[in-house]
From Swiss-Prot:
Catalytic activities: D-glyceraldehyde 3-phosphate + phosphate + NAD(+) = (2R)-3-phospho-glyceroyl phosphate + NADH + H(+)
Main location: cytoplasm
Record protein name field: Glyceraldehyde-3-phosphate dehydrogenase
Homology family: Belongs to the glyceraldehyde-3-phosphate dehydrogenase family.
UniProt xrefs under Pfam families: Gp_dh_C, Gp_dh_N
Any Gene Ontology CC annotation: cytosol
Compartment(s) where it occurs, according to its Swiss-Prot or TrEMBL record: Cytoplasm
Length: 335
Protein backbone atom coordinates (compact mmCIF):
# COMPACT_ATOMS: atom_id res chain seq x y z
CA UNK A 1 0.00 0.00 0.00
CA UNK A 2 1.38 3.38 -1.05
CA UNK A 3 2.33 6.09 1.43
CA UNK A 4 -0.02 8.97 0.61
CA UNK A 5 1.48 12.40 1.17
CA UNK A 6 0.68 16.08 0.88
CA UNK A 7 3.21 18.88 0.60
CA UNK A 8 2.61 22.22 2.32
CA UNK A 9 4.76 24.93 0.74
CA UNK A 10 5.82 24.58 -2.90
CA UNK A 11 9.19 26.33 -2.59
CA UNK A 12 12.71 25.02 -3.15
CA UNK A 13 12.38 22.03 -0.80
CA UNK A 14 8.72 21.31 -1.55
CA UNK A 15 9.30 21.05 -5.29
CA UNK A 16 12.42 18.88 -4.92
CA UNK A 17 10.66 16.60 -2.43
CA UNK A 18 7.98 16.12 -5.09
CA UNK A 19 10.60 15.32 -7.77
CA UNK A 20 12.22 12.74 -5.51
CA UNK A 21 8.94 11.26 -4.24
CA UNK A 22 7.76 10.68 -7.83
CA UNK A 23 10.74 8.33 -8.29
CA UNK A 24 9.71 6.17 -5.31
CA UNK A 25 7.17 3.44 -6.08
CA UNK A 26 5.99 3.26 -2.46
CA UNK A 27 4.95 6.94 -2.31
CA UNK A 28 1.95 8.67 -3.85
CA UNK A 29 1.77 12.47 -3.70
CA UNK A 30 -1.93 13.35 -3.76
CA UNK A 31 -1.98 17.04 -2.85
CA UNK A 32 0.06 20.23 -2.62
CA UNK A 33 -0.89 23.37 -0.70
CA UNK A 34 0.49 26.84 -1.35
CA UNK A 35 -1.57 30.02 -0.96
CA UNK A 36 0.69 31.96 -3.31
CA UNK A 37 0.85 29.58 -6.30
CA UNK A 38 -2.02 28.71 -8.66
CA UNK A 39 -2.00 25.28 -10.40
CA UNK A 40 -0.85 26.69 -13.75
CA UNK A 41 2.05 28.52 -12.11
CA UNK A 42 2.87 25.47 -9.96
CA UNK A 43 3.25 23.45 -13.17
CA UNK A 44 5.63 26.04 -14.61
CA UNK A 45 7.72 26.23 -11.40
CA UNK A 46 7.94 22.46 -11.17
CA UNK A 47 8.86 22.01 -14.83
CA UNK A 48 11.63 24.62 -14.99
CA UNK A 49 14.35 24.86 -12.35
CA UNK A 50 17.30 27.25 -12.75
CA UNK A 51 19.50 25.11 -10.52
CA UNK A 52 18.51 21.49 -11.08
CA UNK A 53 17.31 21.73 -14.67
CA UNK A 54 14.10 20.99 -16.49
CA UNK A 55 11.89 18.13 -15.28
CA UNK A 56 12.21 15.37 -17.85
CA UNK A 57 8.59 14.19 -17.79
CA UNK A 58 5.28 15.77 -18.80
CA UNK A 59 3.95 18.58 -16.61
CA UNK A 60 0.62 20.37 -17.09
CA UNK A 61 -2.23 21.74 -15.00
CA UNK A 62 -5.94 21.05 -15.23
CA UNK A 63 -8.57 22.95 -13.25
CA UNK A 64 -7.38 22.81 -9.62
CA UNK A 65 -4.76 20.12 -10.15
CA UNK A 66 -1.16 19.62 -11.19
CA UNK A 67 -0.73 16.77 -13.69
CA UNK A 68 2.72 15.14 -13.78
CA UNK A 69 3.32 12.19 -16.11
CA UNK A 70 -0.43 11.57 -16.12
CA UNK A 71 -0.71 11.61 -12.32
CA UNK A 72 -3.14 14.19 -10.95
CA UNK A 73 -2.12 16.09 -7.81
CA UNK A 74 -4.68 18.34 -6.14
CA UNK A 75 -3.54 21.93 -5.52
CA UNK A 76 -4.96 23.82 -2.54
CA UNK A 77 -4.40 27.49 -1.69
CA UNK A 78 -5.05 27.71 2.04
CA UNK A 79 -3.09 30.04 4.34
CA UNK A 80 -4.18 28.28 7.53
CA UNK A 81 -2.97 24.65 7.67
CA UNK A 82 -6.07 23.69 9.66
CA UNK A 83 -8.20 24.63 6.63
CA UNK A 84 -6.39 22.30 4.21
CA UNK A 85 -8.66 19.28 3.57
CA UNK A 86 -5.89 16.70 3.89
CA UNK A 87 -8.27 14.06 5.23
CA UNK A 88 -10.72 14.41 2.34
CA UNK A 89 -7.83 14.25 -0.13
CA UNK A 90 -6.64 10.99 1.43
CA UNK A 91 -3.35 12.38 2.79
CA UNK A 92 -1.77 10.42 5.65
CA UNK A 93 1.59 12.22 5.85
CA UNK A 94 2.28 15.93 5.40
CA UNK A 95 5.65 17.37 4.43
CA UNK A 96 5.64 20.80 6.10
CA UNK A 97 8.05 22.79 3.93
CA UNK A 98 6.90 26.40 4.30
CA UNK A 99 9.52 27.21 6.93
CA UNK A 100 6.68 28.85 8.89
CA UNK A 101 4.96 26.09 10.87
CA UNK A 102 8.05 24.63 12.53
CA UNK A 103 6.66 24.06 16.05
CA UNK A 104 4.46 21.21 17.23
CA UNK A 105 1.63 23.71 17.72
CA UNK A 106 1.89 24.92 14.11
CA UNK A 107 2.32 21.44 12.65
CA UNK A 108 -0.56 20.08 14.73
CA UNK A 109 -2.92 22.05 12.46
CA UNK A 110 -2.19 19.57 9.68
CA UNK A 111 -3.34 16.74 11.92
CA UNK A 112 -6.44 18.76 12.78
CA UNK A 113 -7.05 18.91 9.02
CA UNK A 114 -7.03 15.13 8.74
CA UNK A 115 -3.39 14.12 8.32
CA UNK A 116 -1.93 11.41 10.53
CA UNK A 117 1.68 12.58 10.80
CA UNK A 118 3.85 15.57 9.88
CA UNK A 119 7.51 15.89 8.90
CA UNK A 120 8.90 19.41 9.26
CA UNK A 121 11.65 20.28 6.76
CA UNK A 122 13.44 22.64 9.14
CA UNK A 123 14.85 22.63 12.67
CA UNK A 124 12.17 22.75 15.35
CA UNK A 125 12.29 24.27 18.81
CA UNK A 126 10.12 21.53 20.32
CA UNK A 127 9.51 18.68 17.83
CA UNK A 128 11.93 15.74 18.05
CA UNK A 129 14.64 15.96 15.38
CA UNK A 130 15.89 13.03 13.34
CA UNK A 131 18.88 12.77 11.01
CA UNK A 132 18.81 9.72 8.75
CA UNK A 133 21.91 7.62 9.33
CA UNK A 134 22.42 9.03 12.81
CA UNK A 135 19.37 8.64 15.06
CA UNK A 136 16.31 7.74 12.96
CA UNK A 137 16.23 4.31 14.64
CA UNK A 138 15.12 6.09 17.82
CA UNK A 139 11.84 7.08 16.16
CA UNK A 140 8.78 5.56 17.85
CA UNK A 141 5.30 5.34 16.25
CA UNK A 142 3.67 7.47 18.96
CA UNK A 143 5.51 10.55 17.59
CA UNK A 144 3.13 12.32 15.22
CA UNK A 145 5.24 15.40 14.49
CA UNK A 146 8.96 15.19 13.74
CA UNK A 147 11.65 17.44 12.27
CA UNK A 148 14.23 16.47 9.64
CA UNK A 149 16.58 19.09 11.19
CA UNK A 150 18.45 21.41 8.81
CA UNK A 151 20.50 20.69 5.69
CA UNK A 152 23.66 21.68 7.57
CA UNK A 153 22.89 19.44 10.55
CA UNK A 154 22.32 16.59 8.07
CA UNK A 155 25.80 17.24 6.66
CA UNK A 156 27.54 17.69 9.99
CA UNK A 157 25.93 14.97 12.13
CA UNK A 158 27.05 11.87 10.15
CA UNK A 159 30.63 13.20 10.04
CA UNK A 160 30.60 14.09 13.74
CA UNK A 161 29.15 10.67 14.59
CA UNK A 162 32.00 8.81 12.87
CA UNK A 163 34.67 10.99 14.49
CA UNK A 164 33.09 10.80 17.93
CA UNK A 165 32.54 7.03 17.76
CA UNK A 166 36.13 6.34 16.67
CA UNK A 167 38.21 9.03 18.37
CA UNK A 168 35.93 11.00 20.71
CA UNK A 169 35.21 14.71 20.33
CA UNK A 170 36.34 16.92 23.21
CA UNK A 171 34.89 20.07 21.62
CA UNK A 172 34.55 21.62 18.20
CA UNK A 173 33.67 24.60 16.03
CA UNK A 174 31.86 24.46 12.71
CA UNK A 175 31.65 26.95 9.87
CA UNK A 176 29.33 26.33 6.95
CA UNK A 177 30.13 28.19 3.76
CA UNK A 178 26.54 28.29 2.55
CA UNK A 179 24.89 29.09 -0.77
CA UNK A 180 22.21 31.75 -1.17
CA UNK A 181 18.73 30.93 0.13
CA UNK A 182 15.31 32.46 -0.57
CA UNK A 183 15.29 34.61 2.58
CA UNK A 184 18.22 36.73 1.35
CA UNK A 185 17.99 39.98 -0.63
CA UNK A 186 18.73 40.57 -4.31
CA UNK A 187 19.70 44.17 -3.44
CA UNK A 188 20.26 45.90 -0.08
CA UNK A 189 16.97 46.01 1.81
CA UNK A 190 15.44 45.99 5.29
CA UNK A 191 16.22 43.04 7.54
CA UNK A 192 15.49 44.20 11.06
CA UNK A 193 16.51 41.06 12.98
CA UNK A 194 19.71 40.49 11.01
CA UNK A 195 21.16 43.67 9.53
CA UNK A 196 23.88 41.86 7.58
CA UNK A 197 21.23 39.55 6.12
CA UNK A 198 19.66 42.53 4.39
CA UNK A 199 22.69 43.10 2.18
CA UNK A 200 22.93 42.07 -1.49
CA UNK A 201 23.26 38.27 -1.63
CA UNK A 202 24.92 38.13 -5.04
CA UNK A 203 27.80 40.47 -4.20
CA UNK A 204 28.77 39.72 -0.61
CA UNK A 205 30.14 37.13 1.78
CA UNK A 206 27.71 37.50 4.69
CA UNK A 207 28.44 36.19 8.20
CA UNK A 208 25.32 34.70 9.77
CA UNK A 209 24.24 32.64 12.75
CA UNK A 210 23.23 28.98 12.56
CA UNK A 211 21.98 26.52 15.13
CA UNK A 212 23.11 23.55 13.03
CA UNK A 213 26.12 22.60 15.17
CA UNK A 214 24.26 22.90 18.47
CA UNK A 215 21.45 20.80 16.97
CA UNK A 216 23.89 17.90 16.56
CA UNK A 217 23.72 17.63 20.35
CA UNK A 218 20.01 16.87 20.04
CA UNK A 219 20.55 13.96 17.66
CA UNK A 220 23.81 12.78 19.29
CA UNK A 221 23.24 13.49 23.03
CA UNK A 222 26.88 12.68 23.83
CA UNK A 223 27.89 15.81 21.87
CA UNK A 224 25.43 18.13 23.57
CA UNK A 225 27.23 21.36 24.49
CA UNK A 226 30.42 20.32 22.70
CA UNK A 227 29.77 21.89 19.28
CA UNK A 228 28.74 25.33 18.07
CA UNK A 229 29.09 27.12 14.78
CA UNK A 230 28.44 29.95 12.37
CA UNK A 231 27.59 30.45 8.71
CA UNK A 232 29.13 32.43 5.87
CA UNK A 233 26.57 33.06 3.11
CA UNK A 234 28.29 33.21 -0.29
CA UNK A 235 27.09 34.11 -3.82
CA UNK A 236 26.58 30.60 -5.23
CA UNK A 237 23.13 29.21 -6.07
CA UNK A 238 23.48 25.76 -4.48
CA UNK A 239 25.92 23.37 -2.76
CA UNK A 240 27.50 24.30 0.56
CA UNK A 241 30.47 23.05 2.55
CA UNK A 242 31.04 22.34 6.24
CA UNK A 243 34.36 23.07 7.93
CA UNK A 244 34.48 21.10 11.19
CA UNK A 245 37.43 21.81 13.48
CA UNK A 246 37.61 19.52 16.50
CA UNK A 247 39.78 18.61 19.45
CA UNK A 248 39.92 14.84 19.76
CA UNK A 249 40.00 12.76 22.93
CA UNK A 250 42.13 10.07 21.30
CA UNK A 251 45.25 10.81 19.25
CA UNK A 252 45.10 9.97 15.54
CA UNK A 253 46.83 10.62 12.24
CA UNK A 254 44.95 12.29 9.39
CA UNK A 255 45.18 9.00 7.49
CA UNK A 256 43.53 7.10 10.35
CA UNK A 257 40.71 9.66 10.48
CA UNK A 258 40.27 9.45 6.71
CA UNK A 259 40.17 5.66 6.81
CA UNK A 260 37.49 5.69 9.52
CA UNK A 261 35.32 8.01 7.41
CA UNK A 262 35.94 5.95 4.26
CA UNK A 263 34.97 2.75 6.07
CA UNK A 264 31.73 4.33 7.33
CA UNK A 265 30.93 5.62 3.83
CA UNK A 266 31.15 2.04 2.54
CA UNK A 267 29.43 0.56 5.58
CA UNK A 268 26.81 1.80 8.02
CA UNK A 269 26.56 5.25 6.39
CA UNK A 270 26.59 4.10 2.76
CA UNK A 271 24.43 6.44 0.68
CA UNK A 272 24.43 9.07 3.45
CA UNK A 273 28.10 9.94 3.93
CA UNK A 274 30.25 10.08 0.80
CA UNK A 275 34.03 10.12 0.45
CA UNK A 276 36.24 11.62 -2.25
CA UNK A 277 39.96 12.07 -2.86
CA UNK A 278 39.41 14.00 -6.11
CA UNK A 279 40.27 17.70 -6.61
CA UNK A 280 36.64 18.78 -6.44
CA UNK A 281 34.81 22.13 -6.29
CA UNK A 282 31.25 23.00 -5.28
CA UNK A 283 29.48 22.49 -8.63
CA UNK A 284 30.76 18.90 -8.73
CA UNK A 285 28.14 18.12 -6.07
CA UNK A 286 25.12 19.70 -7.74
CA UNK A 287 22.34 17.12 -7.63
CA UNK A 288 24.17 14.90 -5.12
CA UNK A 289 21.79 12.89 -2.95
CA UNK A 290 24.33 12.38 -0.16
CA UNK A 291 23.84 14.23 3.13
CA UNK A 292 27.58 14.82 3.36
CA UNK A 293 30.63 14.11 1.16
CA UNK A 294 33.98 14.13 2.97
CA UNK A 295 36.75 15.88 1.00
CA UNK A 296 39.86 13.95 2.01
CA UNK A 297 42.28 16.26 0.20
CA UNK A 298 40.93 19.46 1.77
CA UNK A 299 41.30 18.71 5.49
CA UNK A 300 44.33 19.48 7.66
CA UNK A 301 45.77 18.23 10.95
CA UNK A 302 47.80 20.42 13.30
CA UNK A 303 48.45 17.86 16.01
CA UNK A 304 47.26 14.31 16.75
CA UNK A 305 44.27 15.73 18.65
CA UNK A 306 43.46 18.86 16.61
CA UNK A 307 42.01 18.51 13.11
CA UNK A 308 39.98 20.36 10.48
CA UNK A 309 37.62 18.28 8.33
CA UNK A 310 35.82 19.43 5.18
CA UNK A 311 32.54 17.98 3.88
CA UNK A 312 30.31 19.05 0.97
CA UNK A 313 26.53 18.92 0.59
CA UNK A 314 23.89 19.88 -1.93
CA UNK A 315 21.83 21.83 0.59
CA UNK A 316 18.72 21.49 -1.60
CA UNK A 317 18.77 18.08 -3.28
CA UNK A 318 20.67 16.08 -0.66
CA UNK A 319 18.47 17.43 2.12
CA UNK A 320 15.23 16.84 0.18
CA UNK A 321 16.31 13.24 -0.42
CA UNK A 322 16.69 12.74 3.33
CA UNK A 323 13.22 14.23 3.92
CA UNK A 324 11.77 11.49 1.71
CA UNK A 325 13.97 8.84 3.38
CA UNK A 326 12.74 9.93 6.82
CA UNK A 327 9.15 9.85 5.57
CA UNK A 328 9.61 6.24 4.42
CA UNK A 329 11.18 5.30 7.75
CA UNK A 330 8.37 6.91 9.76
CA UNK A 331 5.72 5.22 7.60
CA UNK A 332 7.39 1.81 7.89
CA UNK A 333 7.76 2.14 11.66
CA UNK A 334 4.13 3.24 11.98
CA UNK A 335 2.62 0.24 10.17
Amino acid sequence: MAITIGINGFGRIGRLVLRIALQRSDIKVVAVNDPFIAPEYAAYMFKYDSTHGRYKGEVTSKDDSLVIDGQSIKVFGEKDPASIPWGKAGVDYVIESTGVFTTTEGAQKHIDGGAKKVIITAPSSDAPMFVVGVNEQKYTPDLKIVSNASCTTNCLAPLAKVINDKFGIEEGLMTTVHSITATQKTVDGPSHKDWRGGRTASGNIIPSSTGAAKAVGKVIPELNGKLTGMSLRVPTVDVSVVDLTVRLKKSATYEEISEAIKAASNGELKGILGYTEDAVVSTDFLGSDYSSIFDQKAGILLSPTFVKLISWYDNEFGYSTRVVDLLEHVAKASN
